[in-house]
A protein has these predicted regions:
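A structure-centric signal for secondary-structure junctions around beta-strands
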Residues: 14, 27-29, 61, 136, ...
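Class I S-adenosyl-L-methionine
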Residues: 183-234
């Protein structure tokens, strides 16, 4: 029998942020719901680890930018890599507060001394250097939505336009990688990344949840090491 427990709740200008725990067949599962949209849960988090690995293919990275704190799994996966500094931008300030309070074990990952949490909109980081941390970064990880077809906030659609993707790409160091998590393959996103640089790749990850199989997708785009890596001009 399944039971639900609310761990934390906050209403922001963008809607309700709900963190809850459910017991399902003896398993404790934490889930995050934002603005009425199911953002994620803790039942299967292997793709967060894969996201960090694909974004950080090299042995060492000085700086990494993570867009979206969520339940902290992506940040924890990045922390497990050889990284000097991790900048995390989260639009819902309550999630940062819950992280400092250690409401869940994975949110405590943000207490890593290498990690700095910024309350703000990741779009502004790419659009205006006066907001939040300033690049460039060796890796940029976007884990703010379930992909461009399943947005938590409609305004996030700007991130996945040609202009938005180019803005993120421009803030990578030479050899740096942009990685984007999606709950399913998005051909339009793949095409948009290919228009920027030939290094764009689609990684399909098959995950079994219960009796169902899902094909999640991670998209990566890397800047050349031996040049300034300018985006292709149309």
């Amino acid at each position: 029998m399944e039971s639900l427990e609310t761990l934390a709740r906050h209403v922001s200008p963008r809607g309700e942020v709900l963190l809850r725990r459910r017991i399902d067949e003896g398993h404790c599962i934490e889930e995050l719901i934002i603005n009425g949209v199911f953002a994620m849960d803790s039942s299967e988090t292997s793709t967060e680890s894969m996201l960090a690995e694909l974004a950080l293919p090299n042995e060492h990275a000085q700086r990494v930018l993570v867009g979206g704190l969520g339940l902290g799994y992506t940040v924890a996966a990045v922390s497990a890599q050889n990284v000097d500094a991790i900048d995390v931008v989260e639009i819902e300030e309550c999630l940062i507060d819950w992280s400092h309070r250690g409401v869940t074990a994975t949110l405590k990952a943000a207490a890593d001394p290498r990690t700095r949490l910024y309350a703000g909109d990741i779009r502004e980081v790419f659009g205006d250097a006066s907001h939040g941390p300033v690049g460039p970064w060796d890796a940029i990880i976007l884990d703010v939505d379930n992909g461009p077809d399943f947005l938590v906030f409609e305004e996030n659609s700007d991130l996945y336009t040609d202009a938005g993707l180019r803005a993120a790409y421009a803030r990578l160091t030479p050899g740096g990688t942009l990685a984007i998590w999606c709950q399913c393959p998005v051909p339009a996103l793949s095409a948009a990344l290919q228009r920027i640089a030939p290094s764009a790749e689609e990684h399909i990850i098959e995950v079994v949840r219960g009796q169902r199989s899902f094909g999640y997708a991670i998209y990566t785009l890397s800047r050349p090491r031996d040049s300034i890596g300018r985006a292709r001009q149309e």
